[in-house]
Every structure is written in structure tokens, then in C-alpha cells.
Amino acid sequence: RDMLDDPDDLAILDGVLGLSSAFRREAIAEGVETLAHGEILLKLGCNLGQGYVIARPMPAAAIPAWLAAWRPDPSWLDQTPISRDDLPILFTWVEHRAWVAKVVGFVQGERNTPPPLQHQQCRFGLWLGHDARLRKDDHFTIKALEPLHIEIHALASELIALKLAGRSDAAMAQLTELHRLRDSLLAKLLSMLQ
């Protein structure tokens, strides 16, 4: 369930899917709660799932009518599994979401300490500085990621400084901008997986 925000959960899921493949079995994902969960599972090659975004619990007698009416979300159609070479991009996507969530948690008073703020030292920055450079076919996307990543870290540093200075309201007022920048960066990353 936390695979969208916890790199360790995504690693566990990847391992379970690898085991199911090794034993020639199909895994059924439990807890598919959002469209994003479904998209990531499909990218990992998991085509079977159950959860609230697919169907709420129902009596057995209601299943035939549900089967006749259910259609997958358009965002799930034509999804193809990513290659093993592209897994670092997916992990980077999750790690960046998790990092922003930690910044937001600190600003909102849900965490006692902020995450590391140096843009070169976060997992995304490390990927961008090394593994991303090896991807020749994504050169223009990667070039667009660098300034956006730096801008996100600069804003996060500003928000944390405001919070530490006792100006939580000013920091909270800028969370929408942090989310906008995050969403832009994540969309660029996902475009590399198409």
C-alpha cells in the first residue's frame, strides 16, 4: 500500500513479483486503492489486483453484474511492463515522492526532523548525477530535470527555514507550489518510462 511513498515497500513488491515469475506463478496485488497503485503495478508487470479502486466489497450475488459493467480506467489501458533497465527510474520516482512527503511532514509538524536538503545528496540527486547520465536516449528530459530538481530543493530549504523561524503559516502557504514542482518533476520521470 505504501509503494508509492516508500522505496522499501516498492523493493519488496519487486522482489515478490520476481519470485512469482521464478516459480511461474502470477501474483495478485492486494490493496490497489488508487489509480496510481494500478499504474505502477502494471509497469512492474503485475496484471492482477484487488482493492477499492477496482471494486468495493460486495455480496457474491452482485459479482456477475459488476463483471458485466466494470471497465478498467483509461490510464491502465495500453500500459506495458517496464524493462529491468528502467527500474531505477521508478525507484527514483518513489524516492522523490517520499522525500517531498518528509519535507511536508516537517512543515506540518508531523515530523521532528527535516530530510537532508542538499540536492546532490538525496537519492534522486545521486541518480541524476550518475545513472541518468548513462541514458543517452533521454538526454533532453534529463537536462530538464536538473534545474527543476534544484528549484524543488531550494523551495524545500526555504520552507524548512520558515518553519524553524516560527513562521509555519508562511511555510504552509507555499506547500502548493512545492507539490506543483514535485508533480512536474514526477511527470517528466514517468515520461521516460513510456
Roles of regions detected by a PLM:
Residues 8, 12, 28, 33, ...:
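Conserved acidic
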Residues 39, 43, 65-194:
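Non-catalytic regulatory/interaction regions at protein termini and inter-domain linkers
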Residues 19, 23, 30, 52-54, ...:
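Short alpha-helical scaffold segments that flank and stabilize functional sites
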Residues 1-24, 36-40:
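Bacterial c-di-GMP phosphodiesterase catalytic domain signature
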Residues 26-69:
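Cyclic nucleotide signaling catalytic output domains
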